[in-house]
Amino acid sequence: MASSSSNRQFSHRNANTFLTYPKCPENPEIACQMIWELVVRWIPKYILCAREAHKDGSLHLHALLQTEKPVRISDSRFFDINGFHPNIQSAKSVNRVRDYILKEPLAVFERGTFIPRKSPFLGKSDSEVKEKKPSKDEIMRDIISHATSKEEYLSMIQKELPFDWSTKLQYFEYSANKLFPEIQEEFTNPHPPSSPDLLCNESINDWLQPNIFQVSPEAYMLLQPTCYTLEDAISDLQWMDSVSSHQMKDQESRASTSSAQQEPENLLGPEA
């Protein structure tokens, strides 16, 4: 099977964008400048890029992008840089995303002024105001609109809804197969058309002889009670093969030229 894909329309619309470039050794400063230039039409205000290391030593890149106008794209490859493709998500909580990016960076680059989430009303402290959590419907809607493959879809669900993922994985796998169906491999005929032999009779005969027409000596001994030894069975089979081959050749050599077919003999009925 080919890798899963889908004809679904990718969609991203948000002023706060969280990008993750797996296995990307790109310099954060260079990546920031490239991403900044991609979103000029939406008036970029802030970008943060940080390079981190996986446990296996490979490098990956995180980026938080904030724009004055919501970024609207339908091309999942829009944020590709130098051949590296990112996972694109809406940053629902820019404060948490920024803290996550800055947890253990190897290198960091920032440009612009960070725009934190809105301040609490009526003089309440930030700790007194609980940030509204998105509903499961909102989370799944965002995942469906951003996922570009079956693997990415399941990975995003595992990250955002770990309990549901662990208890309802079979349902998520079913929806993943529907959203990203496997591409059926095109059938390749092992016997390509040729001229003048179009049916490849040799291959058919090679299969017919041992599977259909051939009787083993052991099977013959079971059917013939008077055959007591394997040698007798082989001798009988060789004789029958020789006789039947000659009969077939004789029939082929005596081809009929008459259109009249032999009628079955009418049998006499019972006496009245």
Curated annotation (Swiss-Prot):
Pfam families: Gemini_AL1, Gemini_AL1_M. There are 3 rolling circle replication (RCR) motifs. RCR-2 may be involved in metal coordination. RCR-3 is required for phosphodiester bond cleavage for initiation of RCR. The keyword DNA-binding applies. It comes from Maize streak virus genotype A (isolate Nigeria). It is an enzyme of class 3 (hydrolase). Belongs to the geminiviridae Rep protein family. GO terms for biological process: DNA replication; symbiont-mediated perturbation of host cell cycle G1/S transition checkpoint. Keywords: Activator, Covalent protein-DNA linkage, DNA replication, DNA-binding, Endonuclease, G1/S host cell cycle checkpoint dysregulation by virus, Host cytoplasm, Host nucleus, Host-virus interaction, Hydrolase, Metal-binding, Modulation of host cell cycle by virus, Nuclease, Nucleotide-binding, Nucleotidyltransferase, Repressor, Transferase. It comes from the Viruses. This is Replication-associated protein A. Residues 245-272 are annotated as: Disordered. Coiled coil: none annotated. Residues 11-114 form the CRESS-DNA virus Rep endonuclease domain.
